[in-house]
Amino acid sequence: VIAWVDGSDPELSKKRMKYLDSNEKDLIPGANPTRFHSLNEISYCVLSILKFAPFVRKIFIVTDKQNPNIDNVVKQYFPERVSDIQIVDHLEIFEGYEDYLPTFNSICISNMLWRIKDLSNQFVYFNDDVFLVKHIKPSVWFQNNRPVLRGKWMLPPYERLIWDGLKSFFQSTILGKQIERVSSFQVNQWNAALLHGFKFRYFLSGHTPLALDKKRLKDYFTLHPEKLKENLKHRFRKYTQF
């Protein structure tokens, strides 16, 4: 599963600005245009999967009424796999949660990937700027029917939390600007650890393909619908999310 967006699309930009006050757009880090840039990385991402992980059954590209138009390049190198590439609109995975659309928040989108129709129980989540560079086996991602976690146990990100707190204090007290704290993948993962009772350490995953279990995600969010809704309500990425 690959999450993708083309930030240069004028329709998407217009939609995004609708949810931003003209005075807010520079104060919300999650609305920074650089978060939505596309340099055609999606083509290389897809081709790398087809070449180096041919055992992958399907590739789902999740997007908001957009199309990366990669059929021709896939047809050129892997003509037999064109039908295995499927575009999934946000409306499909947010069915029943349409009030939270549109969203411009990759965390919210990732929370809903398990709702893709025809998705295998074992699936791998890619960002469009992540590529495979050599042949791999399924065991790289799953062993004994369980996801392989890639990362390391870390102490809580105290340094980042303290620095962010000081910066926020300086901006609001000295500069008089209420600028939101910049969302951090360390802090967002720490927030997830806190939800599960971890107080003194957390497991930090890097910017890498993530092996996931659809049933576990479904079970968790079914048992904790309010936590899901709390995460989904932020149209732009936020510091407090998990």
Place the predicted regions along the sequence by residue.
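Short, hydrophobic/glycine-enriched beta-strand segments
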Residues: 1-7
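Long, charge-rich alpha-helical interaction segments
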Residues: 148-242
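Short catalytic/ligand-binding loop motif for oxyanion handling, primarily in non-cytosolic enzymes
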Residues: 8-12, 67-72, 95-96, 131-135, ...
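Short, acidic, metal-binding catalytic loop of nucleotide-sugar glycosyltransferases
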Residues: 48-56
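Active-site-proximal specificity loops/subdomain of glycosyltransferases
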Residues: 26-33, 37, 69-119
